[in-house]
Amino acid sequence: MKNIRRIGLPIVAAFLFQTSAFSQAKPLIELVEIPAGSYYMGSEGKGENFDEAPSHKVNISKAFRMGATEVTNAQYELFRPEHKKLRGKNNVSTEDDDAVVNVSYQDAVDFCQWLSEKEGKTYRLPTEAEWEYACRAGTYTLFYTGDGLSSNMRRNQTIARDYKAVSLKVGQTRPNAFGLYDMHGNVEEWCLDWYGPYSAEEQTDPVGPAEGEFRVTRGGSHHTPDEYLR
C-alpha cells in the first residue's frame, strides 16, 4: 500500500540501504543481504485501494543490503542528540531500542548522509520498488505472513488502536524470509520516491516520478488499519 495519508502521529522511520561492499569494521546498523530478482509490485483483484493497482512486474537488477530493523532512538540520536527531547511524545517511542519517530523525510536523508560519511559507505533510503520487494521476500500474498497478519502482529495492532501507550521496540515479531523485521506495522518507513501512479508496464529498478507533492511511506504503523500495512 502506498501510504501517504495524514495519520494522527508523524510516525516515520529511516530504513538504511547500502550499495557498497562491507568493510571489516562493524557498522552501526545491522544489515541483511537482499538478492536481486523479480516480483509483481502492487495488488489487483484482492480488494486493493486505487493506488495499489495495476499489479506489474518489477525487476531488481542488483543485490543490496538493508537495515534488519527500523532505526532506533539510540542510533538516530548519535546523529542528532537533541532529538531525545521528543521521546515519549504522544505516549510512544520512549526507549533506546524503540523505533525512532518524529523524523521528517529530510531528517531521514540527512541521517543517511551522516552515516555514509561516518562509515565511508553509501547509505540511502530505499526506493518504493526496493522496499516492496524486500518486504514481500518472495511471497505473493497480501502480507509476507500470508493473506492475514500473524497473531503477534494482530495483537500489536489491536492494542495500538485503543490509542494507549505502546512499545515501538524493534524486532518484536518474527522477520520475513529475508531477515527483515517490522515491515508490517510498528512505524511507517520513508522511501526515496515521490508519490505517483503505478505503471502497467514491466519495469527495471524504477525510481518513481521525477517530482511530486508527497514522498512515499510504506508499511503502515502501530495504529493504522491493516490495508495500510501492505
Locate each region found by the language model.
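Functional-site microenvironments in short loops/helix caps that host divalent-cation chemistry
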Residues: Y40, E44-K46, L86, N91-A99, ...
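Bacterial N-terminal signal peptides
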Residues: P10-Q18
